[in-house]
Regions:
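Short alpha-helical elements
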Residues: 1-288
Length: 288
């Protein structure tokens, strides 16, 4: 019997072939499905690892599996393959909506041990782990790109006070969907929809060069500056009001992601682990 929040039989059948074999050279793995369900329990509840129910096995095993598969890229590969499968049957809608959301970081997320060479100093991050410090405390910003159905295509993490517009092109550059057969990976959406925070002339120009339709309203100050120049201000950029209404899919995706309490508040010390947790949640959304 499948417990609440655990992998369904259908979801397990989809990802099982993408996991390392349970038995092989070296020590035998603990059952993958049990361990993944343990990680999902942690994401759903936001509880400490040591509170993991006994039915999921030792908490150290689940924690180590999360660490190991984060390091070797297993979670990212699973998400990529799930998206490839949907795209091969035409289910991925290449109308991309982007937005960001700030999450409060728990005090325990700070103080990750530094290993190796000193981390580069940044005015936007604390210890280089995607943590920003402000009067409200520590925070991380999630920059998200979703397809036309509101399913996550790409996530970028920054410190909480980082701007939105500088992350738009990195978000799009990270979208590469391999073909299920011959052909180059698809990386260019048909349309990108974003709010006023992304309305910048350089952004519009960059997307125009890529042949991407950009739907974003002008900011009030941009309208005023253009009006002040009179005829030299040029024409306003095209704006499709009906298409812009579809932008709410990215807000709904954030709502679904934050149903996982471990994501609604960041507890992970390492930004790589928080990114992995977001990737796992994205896999769950794609498999629903």
């Amino acid at each position: 019997m499948v417990g609440r929040g655990e992998l369904t039989d259908r979801a397990w059948a989809a990802i099982a072939p993408l996991l390392p074999p349970v038995s092989g050279g070296g020590r035998r793995w603990r059952d993958h499905r049990q361990v993944i369900n343990a990680i999902l329990w942690k994401l759903r509840t936001g509880a400490p690892w040591r509170d993991l129910p006994e039915r999921y096995g030792p908490w150290k095993t689940a924690h180590e599996r999360l660490r190991l598969w984060t390091k070797d890229g297993t979670w990212a590969r699973i998400l990529d393959e799930v998206i490839v499968k949907d795209d091969s049957v035409g289910d991925v809608e290449w109308v991309i909506s982007v937005d960001s959301s700030v999450v409060r970081a728990h005090q325990h997320s700070a103080g990750a041990r530094k290993k190796g060479a000193a981390r580069p100093k940044s005015t936007l991050a604390v210890d280089g782990e995607g943590l920003g410090r402000s009067r409200g405390g520590l925070s991380t910003k999630i920059h998200l790109a979703v397809d036309g159905r509101g399913l996550p295509m790409r996530v970028v993490l920054t410190a909480g006070q980082a701007g939105d517009n500088p992350q738009l092109l990195p978000l799009l550059d990270g979208i590469r969907v391999r073909r299920d057969g011959p052909g180059r990976p698809r990386s260019r959406p048909d349309v990108v929809i974003a709010d006023k925070a992304y309305s910048h002339p350089s952004t519009r120009q960059a997307l125009r060069r890529r042949g991407i339709t950009f739907v974003s309203p002008e900011r009030t100050d941009q309208i005023a500056q253009r009006a002040a120049k009179g005829a030299r201000g040029g024409r306003p950029p095209a704006f499709d009001t009906e298409l812009y209404k579809q932008r709410n899919v990215v807000e709904r995706c954030f709502n679904r992601l934050k149903q996982f309490r471990d994501l609604a508040t960041r507890y992970a010390k390492r930004v790589a682990y928080y990114q992995a947790e977001l990737t796992i949640a994205a896999i769950v959304l794609w498999l629903r």
